[in-house]
């Protein structure tokens, strides 16, 4: 109750947090440590790279300055927005609101940017110039830096290399075919035929792929009234291309994260966040309990054939803090400086599969001694995409993620029945049209 009352007060008194980047006197004291609760999305296991860094901070800089960070929720980027809203509303069973938390810009907007720390009060323009400009810009809402960049991701294709080797040997398939969506769907159909009905690829964020394909074909503005412009014919055509693949069983909507389907042999490939590499195991375990090395392969995101404007999605949460006290805001700023220091930011990115946000760290990737070959492959693909493509941020639409989740949940249910419905005589176009109507119903 006290926390929600303070947040209301902070909204009414924007000057409650004093500018800290120019102040010389600290509010922190090792004799009376400032406690910060934190929610994050970097691995839900206790020994995640983020948790190891938090322990290191508490034992070093935190102890020296009087800051103690305590993880009170480890979750994922798809769920954290709803969990924050439940906590803010005080719903039964909800956790207490954290001081510091991972969030998409749309999550920050939904919470109310007036309740959040403006990091520009604690970091100078010179400080922020050390970070990749596009990543910084992502976190600015209505002129306030409310989301601080700590890591970014894109999307790419992960493949079970052992299974792919057999498929390629029998069919002559080549990874270069995946450079375009035409080639992607051609390979998907060939794999379904070769595997006697198995889908080729599980997609984590189909809507984002449809968007990018449409934009590369000159669709123009896609959004209207907090959803999509359903009169945009290029967007509709892009959706229908993916819908036909879904109905035929060439692709499917993943069970939240596609690594699960790849690791169990349900699909040959998964298309999702580059940071998913953290969850790919060294061995694939098939339904009959046989195993074989994953030998993980990676391929860049496909593009529309002939596009002159290749795009790469730029995603990932940053860190936000609720406005409570200047002491807590200063403590959070101290942690962020430490966390995003060049070498540490590079090592964290290398451990988790994210792109670093420090410009110097990004430039140093090429010389980083990766322990696993799959991570070296990942950053090779990152560099290839970075050179050839234009980054594009996620749509910052309040309520977008909830609508997308509802659509994906519906498609997961429908995709189970599509093979039988096709066999029973329903047409491919009619079933693909059914998926379009689902998207329209979410408006």
Annotated model-derived regions:
Residues 102-156, 182-185, 293-302:
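Hinge/lid segment of periplasmic solute-binding proteins
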Residues 185-189, 225-256, 297, 301:
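Glycine-centered hinge/linker elements that transmit conformational signals in sensory
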Residues 120-131, 174-177, 219-238, 244, ...:
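Short, solvent-exposed loop/beta-turn-alpha elements that line the ligand-binding surface or hinge
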Residues 63-134, 166-170, 268-269, 287-290:
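Extracytoplasmic "Venus flytrap"/periplasmic binding protein-like
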Residues 142-150, 155, 182-228:
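Extracytoplasmic/periplasmic solute-binding protein
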Residues 359-366, 370-373, 383-443:
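Conserved C-terminal helix/tail region of periplasmic/extracytoplasmic solute-binding proteins
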Residues 287-356, 360:
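Extracytoplasmic/periplasmic substrate-recognition and gating elements
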Residues 2, 7-107, 422, 426, ...:
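Conserved N-terminal structural module of periplasmic/extracytoplasmic solute-binding proteins
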């Amino acid at each position: 109750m006290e926390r929600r009352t303070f947040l209301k007060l902070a909204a009414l008194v924007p000057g409650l947090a004093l500018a800290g980047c120019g102040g010389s006197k600290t509010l922190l004291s090792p004799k009376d440590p400032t406690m910060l609760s934190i929610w994050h999305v970097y691995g839900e296991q206790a020994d995640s790279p983020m948790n190891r860094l938090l322990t290191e901070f508490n034992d070093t800089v935190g102890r020296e300055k009087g800051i103690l960070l305590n993880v009170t929720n480890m979750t994922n980027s798809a769920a954290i927005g709803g969990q924050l809203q439940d906590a803010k509303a005080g719903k039964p069973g909800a956790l207490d609101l954290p001081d510091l938390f991972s969030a998409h810009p749309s999550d920050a907007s939904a919470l109310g940017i007036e309740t959040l720390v403006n990091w520009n009060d604690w970091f100078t323009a010179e400080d922020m110039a050390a970070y990749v400009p596009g990543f910084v810009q992502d976190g600015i809402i209505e002129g306030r830096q409310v989301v601080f960049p700590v890591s970014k991701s894109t999307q790419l294709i992960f493949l079970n290399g052992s299974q792919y080797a057999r498929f390629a040997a029998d069919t002559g398939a080549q990874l270069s075919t995946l450079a375009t969506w035409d080639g992607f769907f051609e390979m998907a159909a060939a794999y379904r035929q070769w595997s006697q009905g198995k889908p080729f690829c599980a997609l984590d964020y189909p809507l984002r792929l449809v968007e990018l394909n449409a934009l590369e074909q000159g669709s123009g503005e896609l959004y209207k009234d907090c959803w999509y412009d359903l009169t945009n014919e290029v967007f509709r055509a892009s959706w229908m291309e993916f819908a036909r693949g879904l109905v035929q069983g060439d692709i499917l909507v993943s069970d939240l994260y596609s690594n699960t389907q790849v690791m169990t042999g349900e699909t040959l490939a998964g298309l999702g966040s580059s940071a998913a590499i953290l969850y790919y195991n060294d061995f694939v375990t098939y339904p009959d309990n046989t195993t074989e090395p994953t030998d993980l392969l990676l391929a860049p995101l496909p593009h529309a054939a002939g596009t002159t404007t290749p795009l790469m999605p730029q995603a990932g949460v940053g860190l936000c803090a609720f406005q409570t006290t200047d002491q807590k805001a200063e403590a959070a700023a101290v942690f962020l400086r430490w966390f995003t220091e060049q070498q540490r930011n590079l090592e964290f990115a290398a451990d988790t599969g994210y792109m670093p946000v420090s410009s110097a760290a990004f430039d140093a990737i090429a010389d980083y001694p990766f322990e696993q070959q799959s991570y070296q492959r990942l950053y090779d693909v990152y560099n290839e995409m970075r050179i050839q493509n234009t980054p594009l941020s996620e749509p910052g639409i309040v309520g977008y993620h909830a609508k997308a989740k509802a659509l994906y949940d519906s498609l997961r249910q429908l995709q189970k029945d599509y093979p039988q419905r096709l066999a029973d005589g329903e047409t491919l176009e009619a079933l693909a049209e059914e998926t379009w109507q689902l998207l329209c119903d979410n408006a």
